[in-house]
C-alpha cells in the first residue's frame, strides 16, 4: 500500500518544485534595493539596501562589461543599519572608460560559509544612469554691500555632454536651514552666479549642484561644499541709492552748460569777442582759390557749377553729314551675292573696262552702345572707269582702238543714284570672304561734274531682287583671271611695240587722286598695291584718298 501512495505523490512534488524556486528568488529580490550611478568618467557608485540585517557577512559588487575585457570588484561598506555602498574605480579619474553603447552586468555577492550567494543583479547602462561629481573650487569673485559674484568648476565630466548641463544653487541666510533656502536654477552651462538683494554686513553660505541633460534615470549631483562669505558693511552717511547721486550730477552739468551758452551769445560785451575767437580758426577760402572771389564774388555754388551753359549739352547743332546707306536683310543680301551667275555675263563687263571697289562704313560709326540695335557692317560699293582719257600731249595716240575704254562721265552732285553691285567675280577680286558670309550691301553717290550718266542697263539687270540660292560653280571660260588686275595702258602699248613717253613726276603714280580734281579724269588703282579686303575706312579717309568723290 505504501508504494501506490508514493507513486501518485511524486508527480505532485515535481509539479510544485518549479513554482517554489521563483517564489524564493522573488522574496530575496523583493526585500533588497540595488541602485548604481555613473559619473561619466571612471567611477560607478552603488548603494545596496537589505531589509533583514546580515550578521557577520561580507558582500561585494562585481562589474562585468559586455564589450570590455576587464572586470572590477568593490567591497560594500555599511552606511546605515540596512544600507551598504561602494565605488567601482575603473581607471584614472579623468579617463573615459565607458561609452553610450556599453552595458555592464552588476552583481551583489554575499558570502555564506564557503560559497558566494547572488543577492542582486542588474544590467547597467552607464549613460542612462548619470550622476556627476559635486562642483569644486567655489570662490567669491567680487562682493559688495548688496551683491556677490561667485564662481565654481566641474570635475570629471565627460566630453559627450560637457555643454549640456544645468545647475541649481542655494544661499543660506542667517536664521534659516538649507531646506528652506530658495533654489536658483541655471538652464545653461554657466559656472558663475551673481547674488543680489543681499543684506550689508551679513554672513551667508552658498552651495551648488549640477546635472546633465542626458539620460533617463539621471539625477542631480551631490551638493558642493558650502562656501561662506560676508557682505561689506554700508558706509556711514552714504546714500543707499548710488545712482541717484550720479543722476543729480549729470542734470546739474547739463543745465550749467545751457546757461553758459545762453550768456555768451546774448551778452553784448562777449559777443564780438566770442565771434573773433571762433573766426580765427576758420580759414578763408579766397586766399587759396582766387577765382572764387575774383570771378564769382565768393559764391561757392557758382564756383562749383559748370562753366558751360546747360543748353550746350543738348543736341541743338546740325547733325553731321553721313553717307546714304542701304541696309538689307542678311538672307536677302546672301541671295543677291551668291546667285548673280544666273544672269549671263555681258560683254561690257568681261572687257575689263571698269573696276569695282568696296569698303565698309562701320569704322565711321566709332561708337557702340550696349543697348543699341546690333547691325552688321554694311558694304558700300562704287564703280568708276579704270582708265581715264589720255590728254593729247601724253603721246598715246597709237594705242589700239579696241583697248581704249570709254570715259565715265562724272555724275552731278544733286543726283543720288546709287552704285550697282559688282559682279560675282568682282566680289572675289576685292573681298573673297563676301561669298561665304556677306554683309548687307549699300551704295554711295558718285562725284559731281558737268554731265550725268547712269550705269548701263546690262549692269542693272544683273542685280535681280528676288533670287533663290544657287551653289557656286567654276568660272566661265573666256572670263579673265579674277585675281589679277587689268594692266595699265602704258604696259599694253609697250607690249604692242609702240613707243610710250615716260610720265612726268606727277603722272608716274597711277592713283586716282594723283591729279587735281579739276581735270575731270580718274586714275585706276595701281595693281601693285596690296588688296585691302573688308577694310574699315572712315569718311575722312575716303575723302582724303579720292577728293573727287564724296562718299
UniProtKB/Swiss-Prot annotation:
Residues 134-234 form the Fibronectin type-III domain. A motif (WSXWS motif) lies at residues 220-224. Its main location: membrane. GO terms for biological process: cytokine-mediated signaling pathway; immunoglobulin mediated immune response; interleukin-15-mediated signaling pathway; interleukin-2-mediated signaling pathway; positive regulation of phagocytosis. GO terms for molecular function: cytokine receptor activity; interleukin-15 receptor activity; interleukin-2 binding; interleukin-2 receptor activity. Residues 266-551 are cytoplasmic. It is a single-pass type I membrane protein. Glycans are attached at residues 29, 43, 71, 149. Pfam families: IL2RB_N1. Residues 27-240 are extracellular. The keyword Cell division does not apply. The chain crosses the membrane at residues 241-265. Residues 393-412, 433-476 are annotated as: Disordered. A motif (Box 1 motif) lies at residues 278-286. It is found in: Cell membrane; Cell surface. The WSXWS motif appears to be necessary for proper protein folding and thereby efficient intracellular transport and cell-surface receptor binding. The box 1 motif is required for JAK interaction and/or activation. Non-covalent dimer of an alpha and a beta subunit. IL2R exists in 3 different forms: a high affinity dimer, an intermediate affinity monomer (beta subunit), and a low affinity monomer (alpha subunit). The high and intermediate affinity forms also associate with a gamma subunit. Interacts with SHB upon interleukin stimulation. Receptor for interleukin-2. This beta subunit is involved in receptor mediated endocytosis and transduces the mitogenic signals of IL2. Probably in association with IL15RA, involved in the stimulation of neutrophil phagocytosis by IL15. This is Interleukin-2 receptor subunit beta.
Amino acid at each position: 500500500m505504501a508504494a501506490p501512495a508514493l507513486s501518485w505523490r511524486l508527480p505532485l512534488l515535481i509539479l510544485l518544485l518549479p513554482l517554489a524556486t521563483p517564489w524564493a528568488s522573488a522574496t530575496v529580490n523583493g526585500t533588497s534595493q540595488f541602485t548604481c550611478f555613473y559619473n561619466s568618467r571612471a567611477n560607478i557608485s552603488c548603494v545596496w539596501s537589505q531589509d533583514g540585517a546580515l550578521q557577520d557577512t561580507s558582500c561585494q559588487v562585481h562589474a562585468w562589461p559586455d564589450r570590455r575585457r576587464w572586470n572590477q570588484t568593490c567591497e560594500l561598506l555599511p552606511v546605515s543599519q540596512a544600507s551598504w555602498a561602494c565605488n567601482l574605480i575603473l581607471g584614472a579619474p579623468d579617463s573615459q572608460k565607458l561609452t553610450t553603447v556599453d552595458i555592464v552586468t552588476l552583481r551583489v555577492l554575499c558570502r555564506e560559509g564557503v560559497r558566494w550567494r547572488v543577492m542582486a543583479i542588474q544590467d547597467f547602462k552607464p549613460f542612462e544612469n548619470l550622476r556627476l561629481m559635486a562642483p569644486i573650487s567655489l570662490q567669491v569673485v567680487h562682493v559688495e554691500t548688496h551683491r556677490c559674484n561667485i564662481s565654481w568648476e566641474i570635475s570629471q565630466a565627460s566630453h559627450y555632454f560637457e555643454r549640456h548641463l544645468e545647475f541649481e544653487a542655494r544661499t543660506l541666510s542667517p536664521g534659516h536651514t538649507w531646506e528652506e533656502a530658495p533654489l536658483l536654477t541655471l538652464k545653461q552651462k554657466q559656472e558663475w552666479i551673481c547674488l543680489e538683494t543681499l543684506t550689508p554686513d551679513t554672513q551667508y553660505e552658498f552651495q551648488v549642484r549640477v546635472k546633465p541633460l542626458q539620460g533617463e534615470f539621471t539625477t542631480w549631483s551631490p551638493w558642493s561644499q558650502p562656501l561662506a562669505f560676508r557682505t561689506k558693511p554700508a558706509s556711514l552717511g552714504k546714500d543707499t541709492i548710488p545712482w541717484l547721486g550720479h543722476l543729480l550730477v549729470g542734470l546739474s552739468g547739463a543745465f550749467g552748460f545751457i546757461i553758459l551758452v545762453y550768456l555768451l551769445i546774448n551778452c553784448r560785451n562777449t559777443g564780438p569777442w566770442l565771434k573773433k575767437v571762433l573766426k580765427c580758426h576758420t580759414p578763408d577760402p579766397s586766399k587759396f582759390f582766387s577765382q572764387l572771389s575774383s570771378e564769382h564774388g565768393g559764391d561757392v555754388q557758382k564756383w562749383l557749377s559748370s562753366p558751360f551753359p546747360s543748353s550746350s549739352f543738348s543736341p541743338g547743332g546740325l547733325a553731321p553729314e553721313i553717307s546714304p546707306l542701304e541696309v538689307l536683310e542678311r538672307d536677302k543680301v546672301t541671295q543677291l551675292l551668291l546667285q548673280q551667275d544666273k544672269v549671263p555675263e555681258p560683254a561690257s563687263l568681261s572687257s575689263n573696262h571698269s573696276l569695282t571697289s568696296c569698303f565698309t562704313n562701320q569704322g565711321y560709326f566709332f561708337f557702340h552702345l550696349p543697348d543699341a540695335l546690333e547691325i552688321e557692317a554694311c558694304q558700300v560699293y562704287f564703280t568708276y572707269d579704270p582708265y581715264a582719257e589720255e590728254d593729247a600731249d601724253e603721246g598715246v595716240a597709237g594705242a589700239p582702238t579696241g583697248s581704249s575704254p570709254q570715259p565715265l562721265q562724272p555724275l552731278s552732285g544733286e543726283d543720288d543714284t546709287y552704285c550697282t553691285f559688282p559682279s560675282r567675280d568682282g566680289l572675289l577680286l576685292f573681298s573673297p570672304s563676301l561669298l561665304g558670309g556677306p554683309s548687307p550691301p549699300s551704295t554711295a553717290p558718285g562725284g559731281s561734274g558737268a554731265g550725268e550718266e547712269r550705269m548701263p542697263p546690262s549692269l542693272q539687270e544683273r542685280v535681280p531682287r528676288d533670287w533663290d540660292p544657287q551653289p557656286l560653280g567654276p568660272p566661265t571660260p573666256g572670263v579673265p583671271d579674277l585675281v589679277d588686275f587689268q594692266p595699265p595702258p602704258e604696259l599694253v602699248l609697250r607690249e604692242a611695240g609702240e613707243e610710250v613717253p615716260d610720265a612726268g613726276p606727277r603722272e608716274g603714280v597711277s592713283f586716282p587722286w594723283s591729279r587735281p580734281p579739276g581735270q575731270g579724269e580718274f586714275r585706276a588703282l595701281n595693281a601693285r598695291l596690296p588688296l585691302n579686303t573688308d577694310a574699315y575706312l572712315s569718311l575722312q579717309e575716303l575723302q582724303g584718298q579720292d577728293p573727287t568723290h564724296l562718299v
